[in-house]
């Protein structure tokens, strides 16, 4: 009942907003986030919401999501709950069927190469920050093919592109490994290759 009312209210808001009710937040698209949820938070990847609490940071009291990245459990992220950009980076984990659909589509995924280094850098930074899995797959495939082409010419991948390649793999593969309950990248790669029949 309340979730439907919240979505209706949000539909008529001019600015993206969230509503807080008893340790639960409804994002601008109606997605509910609460303590103990495991989510994706942009380039930080898989995180657990360990608390939603008021803190005074830089002299201002605000409510924050307290996030612990699964791959770096020694770190803590404080993400303000009233920030639309923060909510845009937060999403639910993919389901197993959704991951299977992404894997099955990999062979047909188109690649998009940007020759201008500065434009490519900004584009890839945006993709990493957004954490959209389909966009990350396209980025990984594009860089992988470009890497193979350069190796065939006796050249190496540009350092910037190599770093983007590794970062995209880490974000995407960690989510896949977590959801599919696989022990690491090697197991995931074997899983992907078996699924697409390579």
Label for each model-derived stretch:
Residues 6-31:
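Short, Lys/Arg-enriched N-terminal segments with co-localized hydrophobic residues
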Residues 26-28, 40, 164:
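Low-complexity, compositionally biased segments
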Residues 30-87:
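A positional/architectural concept
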Residues 82-198:
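Charge/polar-rich, low-complexity and marginally structured segments
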């Amino acid at each position: 009942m309340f979730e439907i009312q919240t979505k209706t209210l949000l539909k008529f808001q001019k600015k993206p907003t969230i509503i807080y009710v008893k340790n639960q937040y409804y994002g601008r698209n109606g997605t509910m986030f609460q303590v103990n949820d495991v989510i994706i938070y942009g380039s930080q990847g898989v995180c657990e919401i360990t608390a939603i609490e008021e803190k005074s940071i830089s002299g201002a009291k605000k409510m924050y999501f307290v996030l612990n990245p699964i791959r770096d459990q020694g770190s803590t992220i404080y993400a303000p709950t009233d920030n639309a950009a923060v909510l845009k980076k937060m999403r639910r984990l993919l389901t197993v069927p959704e991951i299977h659909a992404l894997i099955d589509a990999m062979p047909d995924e188109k690649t998009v190469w940007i020759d201008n280094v500065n434009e490519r850098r900004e584009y890839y930074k945006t993709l990493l920050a957004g954490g959209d899995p389909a966009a990350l797959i396209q980025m990984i495939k594009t860089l992988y093919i470009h890497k193979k082409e350069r190796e065939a010419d006796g050249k190496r991948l540009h350092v910037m592109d190599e770093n983007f390649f590794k970062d995209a793999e880490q974000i995407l593969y960690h989510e896949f490994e977590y959801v599919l309950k696989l022990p690491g990248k090697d197991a995931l790669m074997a899983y992907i290759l078996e699924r697409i029949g390579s």
